């Protein structure tokens, strides 16, 4: 395995790992990755469009666990909330999910599987991403494909 370290300045480091990073459970792959989030414990949560919606790794690539089977139709974005929960956006499923880091769905926003009329401005028609305000916890959701 070859590792290339790039110095991005101002204390930012970028490492490129060539080779086999992360052993995977049966049926999982690192293709069609929609987003990636690092939690406060340094674990890497990879949002995929495969059988397992979320693959969780240690920073060194050691596979820990997977979750999300049957939740998402087509995951599109993930955001770590200030409370340590993971927000997942499902564009084809037209829903937003707030989840614990071990995969329990805590809250759903929108009606999964039901799209608002295109260009109606009503939520949701293929949402794409979510941001959480660090001070207030307010959610900002882009409804980017069917309501853009």
Language model regions located:
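Eukaryotic scaffold repeat domains enriched in small/polar residues
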Residues: 1-148
